[in-house]
C-alpha cells in the first residue's frame, strides 16, 4: 500500500509542501523544520536521521512524511542504542485512509532490519493531548509511559 522513499532533491519541495489539518498544527513542526532539525542532528553527531516521503505505491502519490532516527549511544530513558519514529505525518487531504498505520508498519519493518546498527527498541514521543498519535502507536503495539513534566509521552516496543 505505501512505499517509503528517501527525501531527495527531486521530492524535497513536495515533502515540505505537505501539511496536517489546522487542529493538528500544534502537534508537529512543519516538514521544512523537521528536515532542518534532522540536518543539525546529523551534523552534530547526536543521532542518524533518515527522512522519507510516504507514497501511495499504487497511485505513485506523495501522501506523508516520516523520519526514522537511530541513536547509537542511547540516553537516560533508553540507555541502549535504539530507533525512534522521530516524525510521522499524513497530509491533511490523505488522512483516515490507512496511510499512517501502513507507514508505521514500514518503519517497524525497517527498524527490525537494523539498517544503521543494532538496537532492541523502537520508540516514539508525542504530546499527551495528541490522541491520534497515541492511538496509532498503541495500535501497532507500542507501550506508552506516563507523560513527563512537559506533557510528552514515550512509547516503546521491542524490535
Write out the residue ranges for each language-model feature.
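Conserved beta-strand-loop-alpha-helix junction that forms the acyl-donor binding cleft
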Residues: 122-134
